[in-house]
Amino acid sequence: MAAALSLRAPFSLRAVAPPAPRVALAPAALSLAAAKQVRGARLRAQATYKVKLVTPEGEVELEVPDDVYILDQAEEEGIDLPYSCRAGSCSSCAGKLVSGEIDQSDQSFLDDDQMEAGWVLTCHAYPKSDIVIETHKEEELTA
């Protein structure tokens, strides 16, 4: 029995199952991927967002899944961003959110006022929409 699934937002599908033969991921429109598992599949829709990083060297865009920290994805793609603790408890990776929404509930350094003002720690920030972040902002945050 075959089933069809149609998504109209920036989603990708992941197959989650016990080890079993898998069919390779196939690219689809808008950089989406669909995975098909032969047996025992449980599929979970995962949003992927466009993240524009404005660095002192220029702008770079990447796609970041909603369950991956922005710093981790940037490193995966060879983008050099500042960091120190990677625990959300310092300001080395501080940036300023220009547009969009993020979830940084895992961090412990920024207070509510700083987060409302747009400050972000890229080491503990998940995208929740397409976003623009100015990076390398530790000095401005701590001034």
From Swiss-Prot:
CDD domains attached to this UniProt entry: fer2 (cd00207)
Localization per Swiss-Prot or TrEMBL: Plastid, Chloroplast
Keyword annotations: 2Fe-2S, Chloroplast, Electron transport, Iron, Iron-sulfur, Metal-binding, Plastid, Transit peptide, Transport
A UniProt-annotated Pfam family: Fer2
Keyword Transport among record annotations: yes
Disulfide bonds: none
Presequence boundaries: 1-46
InterPro entries per the UniProt record, alphabetical: 2Fe-2S_ferredoxin-like_sf, 2Fe-2S_ferredoxin-type, 2Fe2S_fd_BS, Beta-grasp_dom_sf, Fd_pln
Alphabetical GO biological process terms: electron transport chain
PANTHER family (alphabetical): FERREDOXIN, FERREDOXIN-2, CHLOROPLASTIC
Role: Ferredoxins are iron-sulfur proteins that transfer electrons in a wide variety of metabolic reactions.
Name of the protein: Ferredoxin, chloroplastic
